[in-house]
């Protein structure tokens, strides 16, 4: 079974249907029906007529199911060294057990507290001597006389 295509609309023409039109220059056209033939002879552009295949192709109609979904690029995790720490050090820290990490943290906190105490101990004697000299130089505070409000005039409000 030979199926032809309509020269105007682009639809299939099955055997026993359609019309054949031969021009004087020898070119042969197949039309699905009289509607297509008359539109062709009136020199209408099939790309501007809504129901033709050429129009649908031009305006991208009905191709949504054929189009494959666009692939989005996925972010891939990649491990590399950071300034001040090599990759081996980072991996070693990551693979440590939580108990070991907790012990290290507590030790670091203890060391920081001790250094803070040592700093304060060096500061205290100097600060204490400064305070004693300041206390002797202070003047005694004099109590300010309180203002006594004047008696109200005009009776009951």
Swiss-Prot record:
Function: Component of the large ribosomal subunit. The ribosome is a large ribonucleoprotein complex responsible for the synthesis of proteins in the cell.
Disordered: annotated segments: 94-157
Gene Ontology molecular function, alphabetical: mRNA binding; structural constituent of ribosome
Organism from which the protein derives: Gillichthys mirabilis
Gene Ontology annotations for the cellular component aspect, listed alphabetically: cytosolic large ribosomal subunit
Quaternary structure, from the entry: Component of the large ribosomal subunit.
Short name of any one Pfam family annotated for the protein: Ribosomal_L24e
Predominant location category: cytoplasm
Gene Ontology BP, a term: cytoplasmic translation
Name listed for the protein in its UniProt record: Large ribosomal subunit protein eL24
The entry's keywords: Cytoplasm, Ribonucleoprotein, Ribosomal protein
The gene coding this protein: rpl24
Classification lineage: Eukaryota, Metazoa, Chordata, Craniata, Vertebrata
Compartment(s): Cytoplasm
